Amino acid sequence: MNEQVRSILVQETTKTSKIQQLFLLGVPRAEIARMVTNGNYGFVVNALRRMREREGGLNIHPATAALDYTFNRKFGIEIEAYNCSRERLARELREPGIEIMVEGYNHTTRPHWKLVTDGSLNGNDTFELVSPILVGEAGLRELEKVCWVLDLFDVKVNESCGLHVHIDAAGFSMEIWRNLALSYKHLEAVIDKFMPVSRRDNYYCKGLGHVSDEMIRSARTVDELKSRIGNRYHKVNLEAYSRHKTVEFRQHSGTTNFTKMRNWVLFLHKLVTFATREQVPAATALQDIPFLDSEQKLYYKQRTKKLSA
């Protein structure tokens, strides 16, 4: 296949023709964008759409079939905050039916929400609120109930607080792990712009810029990839896999706002879903992120504007 790819790339023909030939050969769209359009994923998508319209639809093989972004994935969330004692917050959360316990600092997954201590936080009555395993839209509805209580009792966040999201990674192949790490690395500059400055490269959520694409692509095991990225204090934490069979995303700023949480959880879900097929090309702009719909692109465009003001 490599020889066929090379022969297509050297043809004296249009980019559109090369894109269509490579697609029919089974080359992933992100790779086509890298090879033909200098990473312009949108150009590739448009070229293939025109081809489908002209030919009345393509018989697309499984490797390039449309991805299903329905949100039914397992996930977990950790909310760092302050300004309410753990005992009081637990009482108030039980009222709307949230099962919760006050515990000492631990990393054990529970079947209930837990309120634990966290020595990295600043403020009065600091705490970390950790969810049990949540699933899809039902999990988001439970999270929304929790956020109502946090808002009602004036729970606050500051720059020492973060929002950590765990996404189920059981069964990931090494191709998915590599695609995921590369995609986040390639989108890091875009993501940084819709995060506060305090979450762009602090000690507890360091970036991936120190890891070259080749170091990621050549990793043969999760442990090897984990050692190349570094310890758990990175925007993408692979250490969570050995303990919880999850991948942890640590970059989001502390918040009690459900809209922010929901959008970030869905962003990560779609990022992971996309990584099951391919990687996001380097230097992809926000408007060209292939897994976001127009509503989410608008949301993050507005977040970017607000944080740049």
Predicted regions located by residue number:
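Eukaryotic N-terminal low-complexity, Ser/Thr- and Lys/Arg-rich leader segments
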Residues: 8-11, 41
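Short, charged amphipathic recognition helices of the HTH superfamily
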Residues: 25-35, 161-164
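A general structural motif at alpha-helix termini
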Residues: 36-37, 48
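Short, amphipathic alpha-helical "recognition" segments used to contact nucleic acids or chromatin
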Residues: 10-27
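C-terminal accessory/tail domains of diverse enzymes
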Residues: 30-31, 42, 49-156, 170-309
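Helix-turn-helix DNA-binding helix
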Residues: 19, 41-45
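Short, Lys/Arg-enriched N-terminal segment that forms or immediately precedes the first helix
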Residues: 1-8
